């Protein structure tokens, strides 16, 4: 899969899970007899949110986005559906075009340690996926332990 395909797949999933979570919140407010729906939808959305953030960072590094663009992608995921206009802008500016950077190019940035490490992982997608899933699982577990975001500062 190309960076564009991965980003679009995860971005679409993030928007769909926002809709799922908001729907279950509305049902709960209307007296839903199955209140576990919010827990399930929230967990699914939380996992997809973390996946979106990880894919935005990985694709952003690969495509050499400025830090502000990567930070924008991640922070806009906090607001329901705010990633949709951002994603359209990425499409229009062709910021998602190109293949994975698995080999060094003539770009001087390819000589630094971070780009070499990044290319090493990108050239080993199963290892990268295993590392990302491990990190996201640890983060997801920590967030589950902390409880809903509305209770973090009580």
PLM feature segments, named:
Residues 12-26, 46-57, 81:
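Hydrophobic alpha-helical transmembrane segments of multipass integral membrane proteins
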Residues 84-103:
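Membrane-water interface of transmembrane alpha-helices
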Residues 71-89:
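Hydrophobic, aromatic-rich membrane-embedded alpha-helical segments
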Residues 97-122:
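Membrane-interfacial, low-structure loops and terminal tails that flank and connect transmembrane helices
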Residues 138-154:
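Juxtamembrane boundary at the C-terminal end of a transmembrane helix
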Residues 2-9, 33-40, 65-68:
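Membrane-interfacial loop-to-transmembrane-helix junctions in polytopic alpha-helical membrane proteins
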């Amino acid at each position: 899969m190309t960076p564009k395909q991965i980003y679009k797949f995860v971005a679409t999933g993030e928007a769909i899970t926002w809709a799922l979570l908001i729907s279950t919140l509305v049902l709960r407010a209307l007296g839903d007899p199955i209140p576990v729906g919010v827990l399930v939808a929230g967990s699914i959305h939380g996992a997809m949110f973390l996946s979106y953030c990880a894919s935005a960072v990985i694709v952003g590094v690969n495509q050499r986005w400025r830090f502000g663009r990567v930070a924008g992608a991640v922070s806009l995921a906090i607001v329901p559906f705010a990633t949709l206009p951002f994603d359209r802008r990425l499409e229009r500016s062709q910021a998602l075009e190109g293949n994975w950077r698995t080999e060094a190019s003539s770009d001087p940035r390819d000589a630094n340690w971070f780009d070499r490490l990044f290319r090493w992982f990108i050239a080993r997608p199963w290892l990268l996926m295993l590392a990302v899933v491990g990190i996201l699982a640890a983060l997801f577990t920590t967030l589950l332990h902390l409880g809903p975001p509305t209770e973090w500062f009580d």
